[in-house]
Structure formats: C-alpha cells, structure tokens
Amino acid sequence: MLDEKSSNTTSVVVLCTAPDEATAQDLAAKVLAEKLAACATLIPGATSLYYWEGKLEQEYEVQMILKTTVSHQQAMLECLKSHHPYQTPELLVLPVTHGDTDYLSWLNASLR
C-alpha cells in the first residue's frame, strides 16, 4: 500500500516487445535521447505465443517497460513504431493510477 507520499498521476507505462537485446537497447536509447521516456526497463528471456497469419508462432523476445506521461505517449508510440523491425509491434499503454510522489516528480522532470 502506498503511503501519504503517493499521488494521482498522468504517468503511463508503455509495453513493447523487441526481437533481441540489441534492438531493445536501440529502441530504448532513441526514446530516452528524445526525452520521450524517463526510464526503460528491458527484460530479456520473454516467450511470446500468438497467432500470425493463421499460424501459431512462438518467439523469444525482450519485454520493454517504458515510463512516460500521457502528454508524451503519442510521440513515443510514433517513434517506436517508425524504428521497430516488426510489421505490427506490441505497443500497449497502461495508466499509472498512483505512484510515489518523488518518483513521479523525477519522471516528469526527465522528459522534454
């Protein structure tokens, strides 16, 4: 449970997968350099199962967790989509309903 230092927020978490660590690092570096994300967490070793063009696929991927704000999310999604090697990359935006005030302040200050 968050204490009195938690607050409502306009922050969001963006989920994206990449085919390998090098691609994930490149994508993360792009959105960080453009100040569209405050932080990127890269989790290698994810296994994704999905149907693509009628066939069950299984891929080993890197799960990316990117932290940003509502006002930066569209630019981040466009940046990721334009540089991503997948035809249809995973781009999901999850609202952050509450968070630590100090962390959220840092997140906002880290963006352009």
From Swiss-Prot:
<dbReference type="GO" id="GO:0005737">
    <property type="term" value="C:cytoplasm"/>
</dbReference>
<dbReference type="InterPro" id="IPR015867">
    <property type="entry name" value="N-reg_PII/ATP_PRibTrfase_C"/>
</dbReference>
<keyword id="KW-0186">Copper</keyword>
<comment type="function">
    <text>Involved in resistance toward heavy metals.</text>
</comment>
<comment type="subunit">
    <text>Homotrimer.</text>
</comment>
<comment type="similarity">
    <text>Belongs to the CutA family.</text>
</comment>
<dbReference type="GO" id="GO:0010038">
    <property type="term" value="P:response to metal ion"/>
</dbReference>
<keyword id="KW-0963">Cytoplasm</keyword>
<dbReference type="InterPro" id="IPR004323">
    <property type="entry name" value="Ion_tolerance_CutA"/>
</dbReference>
<feature type="binding site">
    <location>
        <position position="16"/>
    </location>
    <ligand>
        <name>Cu cation</name>
    </ligand>
</feature>
<dbReference type="GO" id="GO:0005507">
    <property type="term" value="F:copper ion binding"/>
</dbReference>
<feature type="binding site">
    <location>
        <position position="83"/>
    </location>
    <ligand>
        <name>Cu cation</name>
    </ligand>
</feature>
<dbReference type="InterPro" id="IPR011322">
    <property type="entry name" value="N-reg_PII-like_a/b"/>
</dbReference>
<feature type="binding site">
    <location>
        <position position="84"/>
    </location>
    <ligand>
        <name>Cu cation</name>
    </ligand>
</feature>
<dbReference type="InterPro" id="IPR023700">
    <property type="entry name" value="CutA_Enterobact"/>
</dbReference>
<dbReference type="Pfam" id="PF03091">
    <property type="entry name" value="CutA1"/>
</dbReference>
<protein>
    <recommendedName>
        <fullName>Divalent-cation tolerance protein CutA</fullName>
    </recommendedName>
</protein>
<keyword id="KW-0479">Metal-binding</keyword>
